[in-house]
């Protein structure tokens, strides 16, 4: 489900999506975010839609490609919902994966519980973690809870079970009911214990109350403590005790506006700063240019524009996301209504876009090799071209990084207002199969090609990341 749509048309709704620092009288910006396991903090998330991922469209079709994903370099595999899909009021020909008919079941089109156990085992054998999408805000209309526990749902003034927003294919759950909370916590514990999962991604996590998430996290810490919880939302208070990371929708919207020429490059910095100042210290955000709610970045920005956008996601602080197919330049429709159909990723397109797999492999490898790019503090660098050029440094104990990205579809020049001594160019050369970075010494005066990007590194200044 998509939060951005909730904010698109009204400033009032925007405040629901990007809250002020004050939460229930507490300024959460003065607090510290809960600690996150190292494998997640240093990781790269790979979102998988099993229906679209392979020709067979099931869990085994995912597992069979694990060697490819290991080679790509991702380490957190996020499976979009694998539960049976509701038939009543369904959207499209196959329905939304976010309309869950059975919280304890696996979509028969995806396989069996044994298939999921095999998937997790094979992922762990390759050093990859597995998280599953959990939809706790609403259910399908033919979920058994509708009849067994109608009191679990929100009702309108006439006593009818209602739905959230304009999502007519789902029924809205009511977390003022303590028995619903218990049901959901027990359900999550089942998936963790039965399948050895490494965490969850929670759909529209901003709608259930924060105190439920805190209650659930406290209970599930006793089941498996070293896990990763990702919230589809951007509500600051959730990262104090419950969630490990959330979405950065405001930054994503700023990126779209900048890349489409509707805002200057400075909008990226302004959005980042706004969230940084309002969230708990050390809060993590997932960084994305593409996901299942969007038209493909390559369709919105073109080939070089999509790579430049993802270069920003790989080098800015937070945890970068790769949505399946991005790494080959797939253009298959992914958001609604395509989400409700049986559309496959066109993997052979990689042969015509070899720069895409090279970019993804090499940028992920670069991020892995650099403490600064994984964990370093962000220091924004002023430059003389505020319209097109984004520039910032990342500082860590072992190394520093300098990143320069041209957000415009024309070559641009800029002077960087920072000391560049000691920085050397490590930008992956994606034009050639076995090309190495140039290693050239950085200059404060740069000319950057259309949608171009540069990454420089130098030995660490001794500044440990404060966040």
PLM segments and residue spans:
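Bacterial N-terminal signal peptides
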Residues: 8-18
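Active-site-proximal helices and loops of the catalytic beta/alpha 8
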Residues: 24-29, 33, 193, 203-285, ...
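Substrate-binding/active-site clefts of carbohydrate-active enzymes
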Residues: 25-46, 50-75, 81-195, 215-224
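Substrate-binding cleft of secreted/luminal carbohydrate-active enzymes
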Residues: 313-331
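Active-site groove signature of glycoside hydrolases
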Residues: 182-210, 287-291
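Short, solvent-exposed turn/loop segments enriched in Gly/Ser/Thr/Pro and often Arg
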Residues: 78-92, 133-142, 203-209, 232-237, ...
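Carbohydrate-interacting/catalytic domains
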Residues: 19-78, 84, 117, 122, ...
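Hydrophobic faces of well-ordered beta-strands that scaffold small-molecule active sites
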Residues: 44-46, 77-79, 130-132, 200, ...
């Amino acid at each position: 489900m998509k939060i951005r749509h909730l904010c698109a048309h009204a400033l009032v709704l925007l405040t629901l999506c990007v809250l002020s620092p004050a939460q229930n009288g507490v300024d959460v910006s003065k607090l510290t975010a809960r600690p996150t396991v190292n494998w997640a903090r240093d990781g790269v998330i790979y979102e998988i839609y099993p229906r679209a991922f392979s020709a067979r469209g099931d869990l085994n079709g995912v597992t069979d490609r694990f060697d490819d994903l290991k080679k790509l370099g991702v380490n957190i595999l996020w499976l979009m919902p694998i539960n049976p899909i509701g038939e009543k009021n369904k959207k499209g020909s196959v329905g939304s994966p976010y309309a869950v008919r059975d919280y304890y079941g696996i979509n028969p089109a995806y396989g069996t519980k044994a298939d999921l156990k095999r998937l997790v085992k094979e992922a762990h054998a390759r050093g990859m973690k597995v998280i599953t999408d959990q939809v706790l805000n609403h259910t399908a209309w033919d979920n058994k809870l509708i009849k067994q526990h109608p009191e679990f749902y929100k009702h309108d003034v006439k006593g009818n079970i209602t739905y959230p927003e304009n999502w007519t294919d789902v029924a809205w759950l009511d977390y003022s009911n303590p028995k619903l909370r218990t049901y959901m916590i027990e359900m999550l514990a089942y998936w963790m214990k039965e399948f050895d999962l490494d965490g969850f991604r929670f759909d529209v996590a901003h709608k259930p109350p924060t105190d439920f998430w805190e209650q659930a996290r406290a209970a599930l810490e006793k089941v498996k403590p070293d896990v990763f919880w990702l919230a589809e939302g951007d509500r600051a208070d959730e990262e104090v005790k419950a969630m490990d990371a959330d979405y950065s929708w405001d930054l994503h919207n700023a990126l779209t506006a900048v890349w489409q020429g509707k805002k200057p490059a400075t909008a990226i910095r302004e959005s980042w700063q706004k969230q940084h100042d309002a969230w708990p210290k050390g809060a993590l955000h997932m960084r994305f240019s593409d996901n299942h709610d969007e038209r493909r970045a390559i369709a919105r920005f073109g080939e070089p524009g999509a790579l430049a956008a993802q270069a920003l996601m790989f080098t800015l602080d937070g945890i970068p996301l790769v949505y399946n197919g991005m790494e080959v330049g797939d253009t298959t429709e992914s958001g609604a209504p395509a989400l409700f159909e049986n559309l496959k990723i066109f993997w052979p397109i990689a042969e015509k876009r070899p720069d895409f797999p090279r970019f993804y492999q090499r940028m992920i490898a670069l991020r892995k090799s650099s403490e600064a790019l994984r964990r370093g503090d962000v220091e924004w660098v002023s430059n003389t071209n505020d319209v097109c050029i984004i520039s910032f440094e990342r500082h860590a104990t072992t190394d520093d990084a300098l990143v320069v990205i041209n957000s415009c579809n024309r070559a641009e020049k800029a002077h960087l207002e920072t000391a560049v001594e000691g920085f050397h160019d490590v930008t992956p050369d994606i034009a050639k199969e076995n090309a190495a970075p140039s290693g050239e010494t950085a200059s404060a005066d740069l000319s950057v090609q259309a949608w171009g990007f540069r990454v420089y590194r130098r030995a660490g200044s001794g500044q440990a990341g404060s966040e």
